[in-house]
Amino acid sequence: MHTNGNSCCATWSVRATIVTLSVYHLLVLPGKNIFFHTNPWPLKYADSIYFFLIILFALHRSNLKELGFSVKGLKRSLFIGSASGGVLVFSLFLLDLCIDSTGMANHDLFKNQPNLTISSEKNSIIQYAGLVLVIPLIEQIFFTGIIYQSIHKKTSPILAIYASGIIYSLAGYKLSLGSFGLGFTTSFLFKTTKTIYASIIFHVSCAVGEIMIKTIYPRLNTFLGFLF
């Protein structure tokens, strides 16, 4: 049996992971996509609410440290997460600059790409704050702090990291390279730092990057469309 030092969520078994993911994919996700998408906002976030309830149950059986919130090596984890996320966000600027410098901006694919504006209304601000802060936090605790660690207990780190990437990409019935890369990278960061902080920061950076593509760099929608 493989262990992960002080960070394995020992109370969460692979069997519990299978049951948790089965309920999510067979009940929660179909319900959200079929029945809940036109209902009040709490039901639109049924998946996040489900993740949150599972997190509360996991915390009842363990503690924050076992889910990855250890203060050991905190500065290193924050640096690695910030550096990884910073590289991702800065790469958007470089890619957009590349479109201009190579002349691709004159191609029909990159013309007439409208910039979306971020509304200053209170509801919009709350929505963006949720997308950038709350959702990454909940998803990382669930997918990395709980699911990845339970898989890591029974298999090698490499297989666990790849499995986490696949599971995350399937979480929304949307098998994409971007989703797989996010799940893979956050699990790898967790394995590297032994904490969840770097994974959360990187996920936040991805959420910020997605908003930047929609609002500041709309041409990258075409350039990076294969990822999503």
Q: Where does each model-flagged region fall?
A:
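Short, Lys/Arg-rich, polar N-terminal cytosolic tail immediately upstream
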Residues: 1-10
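Residue-level signature of transmembrane alpha-helical entry/exit and packing/kink sites
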Residues: 9-17, 44-48, 73-81, 123-128, ...
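Juxtamembrane/transmembrane-helix boundary motifs at the membrane-water interface
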Residues: 24-44, 103, 212-228
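Non-cytosolic membrane-interface motifs at loop->transmembrane helix junctions
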Residues: 37-46, 110-111, 184-188
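Alpha-helical transmembrane segments of multipass membrane proteins
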Residues: 23-28, 50-51, 84-92, 206, ...
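Juxtamembrane helix-loop-helix connectors linking adjacent transmembrane helices
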Residues: 37, 66-135, 220-228
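Transmembrane helix-loop-helix hairpins at the membrane interface
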Residues: 86, 121-228
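Alpha-helical transmembrane segments in multi-pass membrane proteins
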Residues: 11-63
